[in-house]
From Swiss-Prot:
This is Classical arabinogalactan protein 27. Its main location: membrane. Belongs to the classical AGP family. Residues 20-95 are annotated as: Disordered. Keywords: Cell membrane, Glycoprotein, GPI-anchor, Lipoprotein, Membrane, Proteoglycan, Signal. A lipid is attached at residue 98 (GPI-anchor amidated serine). Proteoglycan that seems to be implicated in diverse developmental roles such as differentiation, cell-cell recognition, embryogenesis and programmed cell death. O-glycosylated on the hydroxyproline residues. Residues 1-21 form the signal peptide. It comes from Arabidopsis thaliana. Residues 53-66 have a biased composition (Polar residues). It is found in: Cell membrane. It is a lipid-anchor; GPI-anchor.
Length: 125
């Protein structure tokens, strides 16, 4: 029983030191936010937005017809972030690859710990 507690304590200390020593690169870079008054609004959307003087009790009239798109080519997507095959940003790939060894070591030691506890349980029977 004492060996099980000692093994648990050693494993906890080791895994804690691994997690504390690993670099924390999970920070999301802050992007510049644009307030609605600063951005340019397209003429198609402008009638749908309420003016600043409109109270919340008024409703915006809905249009029965949608404006026709200028470009008939639906497959052409002007924003690559919304493309179906868009890859994640390079910064997120770099942070994942830098954490891979620590995560692998963590799972190896967790597996060894579980196996040793199983052996202790079997030997106690």
């Amino acid at each position: 029983m004492a060996s099980s507690i000692l093994l648990t304590l050693i494993t906890f200390i080791f895994l804690s030191s691994l997690s504390l020593s690993s670099p924390t690169t999970n920070t999301i870079p802050s992007s510049q936010t644009i307030s609605p008054s600063e951005e340019k609004i397209s003429p198609e959307i402008a009638p749908l937005l309420p003016s600043p003087a409109v109270s919340s009790t008024q409703t915006i009239p809905s249009s029965s017809t949608l404006p026709e798109p200028e470009n008939d080519d639906v497959s052409a997507d002007p924003d690559p972030a919304f493309a179906p095959s868009a890859s994640p940003p390079a910064s997120s790939l770099a942070s994942l690859s830098s954490q891979a060894p620590g995560v692998f070591i963590y799972f190896v030691f967790a597996a060894v710990y579980c196996f040793s506890l199983r052996l202790l349980a079997v030997s106690a029977i």
